[in-house]
């Protein structure tokens, strides 16, 4: 197996900037996959069980590009009711179009069908709402999105605050759009 350092050596594979690593455990086959990438490209690699190396896929490759339509950076994956939800940021992280969108597949390898936006900016409250993670309360239907944003009127690119909102699904399993609030989630 190859070492994880290979991913971090500024090696550009499939056009993916080596940033924003996210590890996903697929409980169905007890495999660990790492998704990563910026510059509008996302790769996945297969990790060994102690996370010290990469394992080739069945076809002998180490990297697979799994980029959904309009993806820019910040991959996140979760599984719900047999479907793989791939989420990522779109637009420019300092611009007015930065947002979180998602795609769904029947496989952790894709292809991922872009469904729509989950979180977008509300310029009266904040901008730069994008890069995120999802928290799921085990054995429940409670999901939360945690993300960063800049307060309204702040122009400094690195002045960000961490926020969280409840995330819900409709009857078909699609994610309902999340509204940015100043309250966050209930304690």
PLM regions: where:
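Short, small-residue-biased leader/transition segments that mark boundaries at the very start
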Residues: 1-8
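Conserved blade-ending motifs and adjacent loop-strand segments that build the rim/top face
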Residues: 114-137
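Short loop/turn segments immediately following beta-strands, especially the blade-tip
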Residues: 45-55, 103-110, 168-175
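Loop/turn-rich, solvent-exposed surfaces of beta-rich toroidal or solenoidal domains
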Residues: 70-113, 119
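Structural motif
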Residues: 41-48, 95-102, 154-164
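Beta-propeller fold recognition
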Residues: 153-187
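Surface loop/turn motifs at the tips and blade-to-blade linkers of beta-strand repeat domains
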Residues: 12-15, 65-69, 124-125
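Hydrophobic core segments of beta-strands in well-ordered, beta-rich domains
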Residues: 13, 20-45, 75-92, 135, ...
């Amino acid at each position: 197996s190859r070492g994880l350092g290979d991913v971090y050596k500024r090696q550009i594979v499939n056009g993916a900037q080596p940033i924003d690593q996210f590890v996903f455990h697929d409980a169905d086959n007890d495999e660990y996959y790492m998704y990563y990438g910026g510059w509008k490209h996302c790769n996945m690699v297969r990790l060994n069980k102690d996370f010290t190396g990469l394992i080739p896929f069945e076809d002998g490759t180490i990297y697979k590009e799994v980029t959904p339509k309009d993806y820019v950076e910040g991959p996140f994956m979760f599984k719900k009711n047999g479907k793989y939800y791939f989420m990522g940021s779109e637009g420019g992280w300092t611009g007015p179009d930065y947002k979180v969108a998602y795609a769904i597949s029947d496989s952790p390898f894709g292809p991922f069908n872009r469904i729509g936006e989950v979180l977008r900016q509300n310029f009266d409250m904040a901008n730069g709402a994008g890069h995120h993670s999802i928290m799921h309360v085990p054995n429940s239907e409670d999901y939360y999105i945690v993300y960063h944003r800049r307060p309204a009127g702040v122009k400094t690119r690195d002045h960000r605050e961490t926020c969280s909102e409840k995330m819900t699904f409709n009857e078909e399993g699609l994610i309902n759009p999340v509204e940015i609030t100043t309250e966050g989630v209930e304690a």
